[in-house]
């Protein structure tokens, strides 16, 4: 159970089920058992579109591209406001570390790098009125400067207290923002609590083979077994 308006980080070793859990909440993969409740409503059998209408948004690890669609058009579609102003579009792009003037009229095609597409997708999530924001490794493919802008955006969202934020991440700086941490291992919840309760136990629960937390980069500390 996740309380409203909380920032929750889901972490754990690779293959632990983090992305599968997030996709099941969004309806991208079917739940194999139990129920998924959103504000007391059973959404287990609802379609992706129906869940989106209820205010659930999802950011992919590898966002899709849309040839022929401009960035500003995508933001307008996401927001539900076809008349979204240029200034409003630029505001969302600036919040994810993009120079808005360089991107607002560009097409969502192969001319954009993976990191650029990732940041634009996060901007569309911010533009969409949502009660639950799900981000699957939002730091993937993002440079250090943009990563700082991303964490700043998460801090701002958290301070407003208007959304429940669910982030899958290995980045310690993102996890440190969370009100609660859920650690998954082998498809099971190994730990769930505040960061003060969970952080000291993370390495012990993973057996110390390799730390999946990444303080700044993508380096992984190798154990004696390595």
Spell out what each predicted region is:
Residues 42-57, 202:
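ABC ATPase NBD coupling module
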Residues 11-13:
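The feature captures the beta-strand-to-loop junction immediately N-terminal to the Walker
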Residues 188-213:
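Conserved beta-strand-loop-alpha-helix hinge in the C-terminal portion
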Residues 125-126:
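ABC ATPase C-loop
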Residues 26:
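Helix-to-loop junction immediately C-terminal to a conserved catalytic motif
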Residues 62, 68-85:
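Q-loop/switch helix immediately C-terminal to the Walker
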């Amino acid at each position: 159970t996740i309380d409203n308006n909380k920032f929750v980080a889901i972490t754990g070793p690779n293959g632990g089920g983090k992305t599968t859990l997030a996709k099941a909440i969004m309806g991208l993969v079917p739940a194999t058992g139990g129920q998924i409740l959103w504000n007391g409503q059973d959404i287990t059998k609802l379609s992706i579109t129906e869940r989106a209408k209820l205010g659930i948004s999802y950011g992919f690890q590898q966002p899709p591209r849309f040839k022929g669609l401009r960035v500003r058009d995508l933001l307008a579609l996401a927001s539900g406001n076809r008349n979204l102003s240029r200034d409003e579009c630029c505001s969302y792009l600036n919040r994810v570390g993009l120079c808005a003037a360089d991107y607002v009229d560009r097409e969502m095609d192969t001319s954009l790098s993976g990191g650029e597409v990732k940041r634009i997708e996060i901007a569309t999530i911010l533009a969409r009125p949502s009660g639950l924001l799900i981000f699957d490794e939002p730091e993937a493919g993002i440079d250090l400067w943009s990563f700082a802008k991303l964490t700043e955006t998460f801090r701002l969202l958290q301070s407003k207290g208007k959304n429940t934020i669910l982030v899958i991440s290995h980045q310690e700086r993102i996890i440190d923002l969370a009100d609660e941490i859920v650690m998954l291992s082998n498809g099971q919840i190994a730990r769930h609590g505040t960061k003060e309760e969970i952080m000291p136990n993370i390495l012990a629960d993973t057996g110390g083979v390799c730390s999946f937390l990444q303080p700044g980069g993508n380096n992984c500390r190798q154990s004696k077994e390595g």
